[in-house]
Every structure is written in structure tokens, then in C-alpha cells.
């Protein structure tokens, strides 16, 4: 085993199951957890709480650099703790998402958050969940996993999730939305969605979560 803090990155498209896999890996290994998809929402929420102008890079950069946030895997949920307060529910609000879009458009803020994300690497290790963790944020990570699944399977999983919440959704619409997002993510100019060259590509289309976790653990153990 390595004596420093190992980093395990898990990248992949929307709906592939990264969040669930990362939570289970963090729990099984006792590692720290980084949910990079939530980091801009967390910063936006911190700015709102502190009355910081969402268009001011000068004010947002120090806030991003010193962002006091923890991600805790609890059962099937990731609890997000901002400055000691559970803000998981607030993060899901539409206004938080809109504010996150504003701060994410500022280059210096993105750079500050990149450094802040790297600071999550600490003993005993880190599970980093995102889209460019293995290619941009932690290019030197010891273990890189790219979790994929067919667009049809991801749409089907999403439909089941929404139906369990009592929502009436159409499969074709969900599939179209996923395909459009895939296209945007894979063809964007900055940090396009792609597996790192040294990543294990796991296709979870016909696998259950236990099988995915087992393969991931085997790969992690072979690398550390």
C-alpha cells in the first residue's frame, strides 16, 4: 500500500451511477469523498449566505479558495456540510442552481475551485466523483475509473427514480435529454468528457451495483 494519500477518480456521463459507486467506495474504504458536481452549487450557496456578489470574481475567488465544505456518505445519500451546516436540501433548490451557473462562468473562480478540489486529497485517501477528475483535477491519481452505461439504460434508471417520486415522465424525453447532454459534455472545448488513458472503463449497462463495486474494489486493490 502507498504511504501517502491515494486518490481514486470516478468519471463518467450523467446517470451512469457514479454517485452511488463513490458513496459505497468511500464507506467501504473509509476514504474522504469529493462530489465535484456539487462544488459550484456549494460555492454559490456560500456566496448567498455571506451576501457576496455572484458576478464579482474579486469577492468569489477568496471564498472559493477557503470553502469550508465536507461531503459525507450516509446510506444512499451524500450529506453536504457547509461551514458546519447540513445544506443538502438547499443545494437542490432551483435558485441555487441558477446561482451556480453564474459563478461557474467566471474563469478565476473555476481556477480557485480547481485548487480547492485538489485540497480534498488527504489521509486516508480520496474518492473523487465527477466528469474530469482523472483528466484535469487529479491527472496523477493512482486509480482512475470511467463508469459508463448505454444512454437507454441511463434513461431507464432515471425514469424509475422519478416514478418512485410519483412523477409522470416519458422515456423518449429522458433519452433525448441524456443524449443531448452527452453530446455537449463530449464535445465541449474545455475538459471534454472522456476516459483518462490509464482508466479502467466499466460499462454498467448489464451490471448491478454490487457487481460494479466488486470490480472497482478489485481494480483499486491491484493499483495500491
Curated annotation (Swiss-Prot):
One of its GO terms (biological process) is nucleobase-containing small molecule interconversion. The keyword Thylakoid does not apply. InterPro entries: Cytidylate_kin, Cytidylate_kinase_dom, P-loop_NTPase. Gene3D superfamilies: P-loop containing nucleotide triphosphate hydrolases (3.40.50.300). SUPFAM superfamilies: P-loop containing nucleoside triphosphate hydrolases. Keywords: ATP-binding, Cytoplasm, Kinase, Nucleotide-binding, Transferase. It is found in: Cytoplasm. It comes from the Bacteria. GO terms for cellular component: cytosol. ATP binds at residues 12-20. Its EC number is 2.7.4.25. It holds the Pfam family Cytidylate_kin. It catalyses: CMP + ATP = CDP + ADP; dCMP + ATP = dCDP + ADP. GO terms for molecular function: ATP binding; CMP kinase activity; dCMP kinase activity. PANTHER family: CYTIDYLATE KINASE (PTHR21299:SF2), CYTIDYLATE KINASE/PANTOATE-BETA-ALANINE LIGASE (PTHR21299). HAMAP family: Cytidyl_kinase_type1. Belongs to the cytidylate kinase family. Type 1 subfamily. This is Cytidylate kinase. The lineage of its organism: Bacteria, Pseudomonadati, Pseudomonadota, Gammaproteobacteria, Vibrionales. The gene is cmk.
Amino acid at each position: 500500500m502507498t504511504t501517502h494519500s491515494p486518490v481514486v477518480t470516478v468519471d463518467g456521463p450523467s446517470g451512469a451511477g457514479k454517485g452511488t459507486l463513490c458513496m459505497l467506495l468511500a464507506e467501504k474504504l473509509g476514504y474522504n469523498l469529493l462530489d465535484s458536481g456539487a462544488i459550484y452549487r456549494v460555492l454559490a450557496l456560500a456566496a448567498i449566505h455571506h451576501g457576496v456578489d455572484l458576478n464579482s470574481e474579486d469577492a468569489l475567488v477568496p471564498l472559493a479558495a477557503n470553502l469550508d465544505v465536507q461531503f459525507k456518505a450516509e446510506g444512499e445519500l451524500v450529506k453536504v456540510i457547509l461551514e458546519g451546516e447540513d445544506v443538502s436540501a438547499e443545494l437542490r433548490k432551483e435558485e441555487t442552481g441558477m446561482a451556480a451557473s453564474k459563478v461557474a462562468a467566471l474563469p478565476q473562480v473555476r481556477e480557485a475551485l480547481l485548487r480547492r478540489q485538489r485540497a480534498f486529497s488527504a489521509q486516508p485517501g480520496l474518492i473523487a466523483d465527477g466528469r474530469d477528475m482523472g483528466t484535469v483535477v487529479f491527472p496523477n491519481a493512482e486509480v482512475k475509473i470511467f463508469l459508463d452505461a448505454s444512454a437507454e439504460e441511463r434513461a431507464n434508471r432515471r425514469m424509475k427514480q422519478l416514478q418512485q417520486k410519483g412523477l409522470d415522465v416519458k422515456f423518449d424525453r429522458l433519452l433525448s435529454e441524456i443524449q443531448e447532454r452527452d453530446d455537449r459534455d463530449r464535445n465541449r472545448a474545455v475538459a471534454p468528457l472522456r476516459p483518462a488513458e490509464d482508466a479502467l472503463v466499466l460499462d454498467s449497462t448489464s451490471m448491478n451495483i454490487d457487481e460494479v463495486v466488486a470490480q472497482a474494489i478489485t481494480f483499486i486493490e491491484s493499483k495500491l
